[in-house]
Amino acid sequence: MEKRFLSADSLVSDGFALAAAVLQSGWQPDHLVGLWRGGSPIAIALHEALAWKGLQTGHSPLAVHSYTGVDQRQTEIAITGLDALTAILPAGKRLLIVDDVLDRGHTLAAVMDALGGRYEVRTAVAWFKPERNETALRPDYHIHETSDWLVFPHELEGLALEEIRAHKPVPDGFL
């Protein structure tokens, strides 16, 4: 499997592109949820772009923990921040869930299950891996499809020293 190294700028561009797709669809979210960690930079850019175009939305993070290492998942997915979200967002509101990638789909499925139909939900991801998706979920909005191993700008785990030197802006003396 080929590794594709992504830049921070590409995630911002993808957030802007997702905002354009949401606006073009005519659907207007009341609230954005960025899935911590990977969905955060994309959700921030998406939120900024919607605001710049005049669409004001609330925003919150949800921390979703399922990976213990590269391509290794826990059997249970823990979600932090759900109580805070439901405390501020009344049932029936339009909620856009934003993540970096829909890979196997289990993270997004766990969030959808936890929300329990409380909201009108749509999903937006920068990257979709349809061949690896083990759920019936498909993102409502996505920019790219791939089967590549995606290496996000913040990721170091699972990389060889040579890959870090070639693709990561680490400071002198760090390695």
Model-derived regions, located:
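PRPP-associated nucleotide enzymes
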Residues: 1-175
